Amino acid sequence: MIHFIIGGARSGKSSYAESLAKNSGSDVIYIATAQAYDDEMQERIQQHKHQRPSQWSTFEEPIEISDVINNKSSSTNCLLIDCLTLWVTNLLCENKSIDDCKQQLIDALSNAKGDIILVSNETGMGVVPMGKLTRRYCDEAGWLHQEIAALADQVVLMVAGIPVIIKPISSNHQHKS
């Protein structure tokens, strides 16, 4: 089952996703896309690490998240990927083909087994950014979010720590194993 958790900064996305993972009954593999470019980001990363249960496996993968999904998804694992917008940032910074990487991610998710929880920042609820790179970032994130939401079994919008279900789990959902 694919859960897509989206919301603004400090909306409770990661906490909610971690709660879903804890309650999955599966072995949790945390896939972190963040890179520490400054002290503040390093502190955020450390804070997230300390909040996670020690028995969770962690993979720090800023670019090739589809490879981790392909190699680690199973009926006994729950993969938690946090977060897709940082992944888009990493792709832009590394001048990677976003379309190719996005397709690899969609393919990996389509073939994944077990539970997958994806976290991302909603970037499309504000004004259109003035800068070219920022506009591209928001566009790429928005297009990715649309594809992930279409593929996901459940989509949750986090607002002030409250989960708002915008795509409920279908009653005819069949779990892949």
Where in the sequence are the language-model features?
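Helix-adjacent hinge/juxtasegments
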Residues: 54-101
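Loop/turn-to-beta-strand initiation segments
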Residues: 1, 75-78, 112-119
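Residue-level signal for inorganic ion chemistry
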Residues: 17, 48, 80, 121, ...
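Residues at secondary-structure transition points
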Residues: 12, 36-43, 75, 79, ...
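Short, well-ordered beta-strand core segments
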Residues: 28, 79, 154-157
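Conserved P-loop
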Residues: 2-71
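Short, well-ordered coil/turn elements that cap or connect secondary structure elements
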Residues: 25, 51-53, 74, 111-113, ...
